[in-house]
Amino acid sequence: MRTTLLSILIFWLCGISTSQGQDLSAGFSIQEIPDNIWQKMQGKTFQPNDVIGRSDLRYLRVMHWDYDGKTHYGEMVCNRLIAQKLIRIFMELYRQHYPIQKIRLADEYDADDERQMRDNNTSCFCYRKVSGSQKLSYHARGLAIDINPLYNPYVKTQKDGTRLIQPKTATPWCDRKKNFQYKISKGDLCHKLFLQNGFVWGGSWKTQKDYQHFEFHP
């Protein structure tokens, strides 16, 4: 019954067309984690733990535009609680040509967050702790997603007055008054869609700014 219901959900979500009549059925889907993807995740984005397991996660396929107007197919793993929300969001982003450069599994970067951020890769699930702490990240539960991270860095002023910037190569895009490609701004389409679907934006935090980051609190 569970697999049947999931198949119905995939059919319903993917049977939606754009306002121009383009069928999106081949580009957007939700699945339980396929065996080949699960194997790829082992020792990388997935580590043995008591918090989250395979049945809690979903594998998503989406389409997206880049800044040059080219269409790409992307994939990600997320918590099943936000799978439908992410499909709705990415369908609308695609309809309105909102640019996202890459959407690849973090496993392709050996779950190295710095590497994938430098490559401007958008991703969701990765079982890891918050940088510099022992606290589990919302990414560890598949409840957070980072969008175009190179151009939307994490920035925090430390006690000694220096700035911690992640990725380290993102200094040119820390000035949020400037306009540049792949930038997330308060009130733009990406920001609006995530907030409408119950996510919190890291760019609104007070003591630190995580402009790439949206997280969902169940």
Model-derived segments and their meaning:
Residues 100-101, 115-150:
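Mid-length scaffold segments of soluble, non-membrane domains
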Residues 130-132, 142-218:
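Catalytic cores and adjacent binding grooves of peptidoglycan-active enzymes
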Residues 22-70:
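N-terminal module-boundary/linker segments of secreted carbohydrate-active enzymes
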Residues 13-24:
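Bacterial Sec-dependent signal peptides at the C-terminal "C-region" and cleavage site
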Residues 53-56, 136-142, 193:
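Extracellular/periplasmic catalytic domains that process cell-envelope and extracellular macromolecules
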